[in-house]
From Swiss-Prot:
This is Uncharacterized protein F12A10.8. Residues 425-437 have a biased composition (Low complexity). Residues 63-87, 399-409 have a biased composition (Polar residues). Residues 63-97, 112-147, 346-437 are annotated as: Disordered. It comes from the Eukaryota.
């Protein structure tokens, strides 16, 4: 127990004997041991662990009884109730040396635990073609039929390797035998595809400078290695090799991107295992299509015809002539862009004034003139051919701009049009100076 300090009692309140010690100093509880000096330094008391937040009402898993004694020692922290020892600080990732971090993709640890788990579940591999196994199967079938009896009618034999079962066949014994190689149909173009790929490898001269995929452990890498091995064997021996797997592998030769351009040190296969092969092969397919089009005799004939005789300009779609573009007659303009292009100047100044007058109409052109005069003074004149149908762009402007031909002094701001029919109409006034035009 702590020795009580000597205090001087006054009428109003208590004060410590030593005036330098504050009266608000933390009072050490009596159930806490006295701090022991370690190496001359006073040991700091561990504070009580206050459970707050989601753990505020949590109950301790320790047995709560009066006989349990709690000690404040580092050896048995698990039994110390209400106090928490700070755990050892976790080593940060930045403290690791750079040599520990692998600079390449490493998937060696993936699937290790799965193999260990499934290894015990899989049945032991057996020789499926052995005669002993057929005898054992016959024995097991007879014993099952004897014991079970009529309950085996609707049941089927459970196969050791279900992925070897040929669905659709009813013979259970033949299901256990694997398919023979002679049953596989060899495509008629197998020799052509083998020779095609072997000639590619001969053109490249060696397989070593071609950088293969970095992820040889994946399915794509396995296919690549198998294809390269069989293709190299085919380059050495010209005899026909019966290998049904190679027939499927050789169809992916374009997909595997073996071509001459890889030796130019310009294009390289992707090193990233998550890189999409379709993106690379699609670019290469476009490149091959361009080469085929360049060598195609049909395209060559078209190109030679264009060089010999250029295509004549049709009346409906004239070809652009740069020489006559600036000297074009403004009264015969074909496109909307040329219609508004008035920046060029003719040779003489008198002609320019005439062109400006003809191009820029006055405000009274659409209101005061009659229909006949408007038809005569067209700004744009097109060659009217009965064979060529008239498009909306080549339609006469004046027909679209004069909705009412009955009144020559028509103006869109003449509000007599909207007056009720019972009221007699006033005589039409002079032409409006505030026309749209």
């Amino acid at each position: 127990m702590h020795p009580q300090r000597e205090v001087i009692k006054f009428r109003k309140g208590r004060f410590y004997k030593n005036p330098t010690i504050s009266s608000f100093k933390r009072i050490v509880p009596s159930n806490r041991p006295v701090a022991v000096d370690v190496n001359g330094f006073p040991q700091r008391h561990r504070r009580h662990y206050v459970q707050a937040g989601m753990f505020a009402n949590a109950k301790s898993s320790l047995p709560s009884s009066a006989n349990v004694s709690f000690q404040n020692s580092d050896d048995n922290l698990s039994t110390s109730r209400g106090r928490s020892a700070s755990p050892t600080p976790i080593r940060k990732f930045s403290n690791f040396p750079r040599s520990n971090i692998s600079k390449t993709w490493d998937f060696s640890d993936i699937g290790v635990k799965k193999d260990q788990q499934t290894r015990n579940q899989l049945p032991p591999m057996k020789r499926l073609n052995s005669e002993e196994e057929e005898e054992q199967q016959g024995k097991t079938k007879t014993t099952k039929k004897e014991t079970i009896g009529a309950s085996t009618v609707g049941r089927s034999v459970k196969h050791v390797l279900p992925w070897l079962k040929k669905w659709g066949s009813q013979d259970a014994e033949s299901n256990m035998k694997p398919m023979r190689i002679e049953r596989l149909k060899v495509s008629p173009t197998l020799d052509q595809s083998i020779n095609r790929f072997s000639s590619r490898l001969r053109r490249i001269d060696s397989i070593r400078p071609i950088p293969l995929q970095n992820h040889t452990g994946t399915t794509i890498g396995t296919v690549e290695k198998a294809l390269v091995a069989v293709a190299l064997a085919k380059t050495k021996s010209e005899e026909y090799q019966k290998n049904p797997v190679f027939d499927y592998l050789i169809e992916r030769s374009d997909w595997l991107l073996y071509r001459e351009e890889f030796n130019d040190k310009i294009d390289y296969l992707p090193q990233d295992p998550f890189y999409s092969h379709d993106i690379v092969s699609s670019d290469f397919e476009e490149y091959e299509q361009e080469i085929e089009e360049a060598r195609d005799p049909y395209y060559l004939e078209i190109g030679s015809e264009e060089k010999q005789a250029p295509i004549k300009a049709s009346a409906s779609k004239p070809r652009f002539d740069e020489a006559n573009f600036h000297n074009e007659d403004p009264l015969n303009l074909d496109s909307q862009e040329d219609f508004f292009e008035t920046s060029y100047l003719p040779k003489n100044a008198d002609e320019s004034k005439k062109h400006q007058k003809s191009m820029l109409p006055s405000f009274g052109d659409y209101t005061t003139k009659s229909d006949d005069e408007r038809q005569k003074n067209r700004l744009v004149s097109f060659d009217t051919d009965s064979s060529v149908p008239r498009t909306s762009r080549k339609r006469n402007h004046q027909e679209a701009l004069s909705p009412s031909k009955s009144n020559p002094d028509y103006s869109p701001f003449n509000y007599d049009l909207f007056s009720p029919p019972s009221v007699p109409k006033k005589p039409s006034s002079s032409s409006s100076n505030y026309s749209i035009w």
